[in-house]
Structures are given as structure tokens and as C-alpha cells.
Amino acid sequence: GCGHWGPNHLRVFNELDRSSVLWCADLNASRLAKVQSRFPGLRTTTDYRSLLADDAVEAVVIATPTATHAAIAREALQAGKHVLVEKPLCTTSVEAQELALLAGAVGRVLMVGHVFLFNGGIIKLRELVVAGQLGRIHYLDAVRTNLGPVRGDVNALYDLGTHDLSIFNYLLGSTPTAVSAQGSCISQGAIEDVCFATVQYPDGTLAHLHVSWLNPRKVRTLTVVGSLKMAHWDDVDPQDTLRIYDKGLDEPPYYNSFGEFQCLLRSADVHLPAIRRMEPLLKQAETFVGWVLDGSPEGADAMDGWIVVRTLEAAIQSMRNGGAMTPIRVDTPAKVRTAAVPLITGQRLPSESPSGL
């Protein structure tokens, strides 16, 4: 696919020394002509099966509408190709689990494009959480809004919320247990343009997200509140992307007055940790190639993608039930993980390097 996001994948894979882009498929011939003019020598087709039949192609990137992900990924894996599929992995958890099992059976990499796992600020924040510098995490609050682009195939939660759900799981190193969600269909009859969701984790941590296509401001923020410190990430701010606040509440057994309570609020320095500046999409592409060629698994695998899709399903169910807290059933992770063991071997089909994408 070379619509809104596909050309960016073309660019980053072309920039890598260890990969070369051979084909691009899209149903729109004018889009193909445009990318071909930008990348001379690129072969194009309106039938993706043509590139799947090419033995020189070792891996494919799927950046098509979400509803098509499962079918195309299935055919690619069956053709012996490694696969990087844009988020979300697919529309249903049944499809996601089937893809995970298939990837394991054929011994091919199936990576999901949860690109914010390669964001320098999120990576640094994860390091701080794992090191215990924020203390016990009480809650997370994410906002992801903009004015458009409005999609007609999935709602704002599937489109935008997928990012935040993957970030929550990455930072907490945990699988959510329940979700409550509500949304509003404003510009289209049955597709939510704005969604609010609260996700519960096993240790009691709460994670809240607000996503919208109908907002005057582009906002990409995440606040993490811990027992020791608090963090605020703002992906739109190029200077102060990540701030660590030495603020909190020193809790004695009790307090006698409001004045005494105010004294318990602790406010100290604000720290701006050094962040490695890199393009997340380029790093994701580099990681995918490394996984294929070297057997170095990083990023979001099929199981990670499946958990996010299962959470999305539960959130939609909650919306249909007035926002009721809905269990997130992830009752077969061991089966999927076991079957997907070959994913980390980095096996390759016989062909010449560099990798053909």
C-alpha cells in the first residue's frame, strides 16, 4: 500500500544499507506512478500477489486498510515471506491469533508496527519505570488528538488508541485485565470520532486515554504518576519532550488539618533527561531487518499485536454496553507464544543479500 503511510515505509527501507525495496503494490495506479517517479527502478503492481510470487522478495510491509491486514499477511506468510504489518495487526483477535500461530508454523517473522515503541522519549521513560525511579506506578493518562485525518474503515480508538495501548503495555510490562470505553459518532453514522477509555492492569494500575479526530489542536501527550516521581511526555514539543517531576505526596498515617495536608505535598526539581533523537519509523525498519537477518527479536511481535487487538475488541464491547467495565480475556498466550518460538530464529529463505523488501 502506498497511500497515506506507505511511502514513508518506502523511504526508510531505502535508506537502510541492509535492505533494498524491489516492489510496491497498490490498487491506485496514479499513486504507483508517483512513488515510481520518486524511487526509480521500483517495480509496481496493482496485484500484491505478483510480488508475493517473486522469490527475490524475502519480506513485505503491509500498510493497507486495517480490514485487509489479516488476509494479506496470511498469504504473505504462506508464501514464505517475513511480514511487518502496520498497526493494528488486524480487526479481530481470532485473526491475530491465527496469524501468530501461522508465523510460528512457517518460521517467519511477524512484526507489528507499533512505532512508538521506537520513540526516544518513550524508550527513556520505560528505562526510568523499569529502574524504579518513578516508584510504583499509580496511573497513566494519554491524549492523542488532531483535526483529521478522519478514517472510514475503523474508529478513532482502532486508529489512534492502538498507539497508546501498546505504549501502556510496554511501559508497564504487563497485560491489561479490563477496559471501560465510551465514544461518540459525530462526522459519520457508525464510526466513533472521539473515544475515551480506562484500562485496568493486574496490580491495580489504571491507564486512561482520550483520542479524537475532531480537535483543534494536535496533542500527543502522556503523563505517568508514580509514588516517587511523575513524568510528562509531549511528542509535539521538540525541546522538552520528556520532563521528570520530583513531585508527590508524602503520606503519614494521618493529618489534622488542610494546612498540614498542604505541607505533605512535595514539589522539587524538574529534570529533563537526555533522549536519543532518532526517527522511530527508521529505527523500526532497522529493527525489523535485524530480526529477519540476525534473529534479533525486538519491537512488537504477533503476541503483542494480539493483546492490543483483544483490548480494542473489549473496548468496543464496553462502548456497546454503555461503558461497562469489560474483561479482557487473554486466555491463550502460552499457546501462541509456544507456537511462535520460531519467530525469533531469524530464518531466511535462500536468496542473495541485501534483503529484498
Residue positions per predicted region:
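Hydrophobic residues in well-ordered beta-strands that form the structural core
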Residues: 46, 85, 110-112, 141, ...
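Beta-strand-loop-alpha-helix segment that lines the small-molecule cofactor/substrate pocket
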Residues: 59-117
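Conserved SAM-binding strand-loop segment of SAM-dependent methyltransferases
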Residues: 41-50
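N-terminal Rossmann-like dinucleotide-binding module
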Residues: 1-39, 355
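Rossmann-like dinucleotide-binding domain that binds NAD(P)(H)
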Residues: 147-217, 223, 237, 303
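Basic phosphate/pyrophosphate-binding loop/patch that engages nucleotide-derived ligands
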Residues: 101-109, 123-137, 202, 226-230
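C-terminal glycine/acidic-rich active-site capping loop/insertion
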Residues: 115, 228-300, 324-328, 335-357
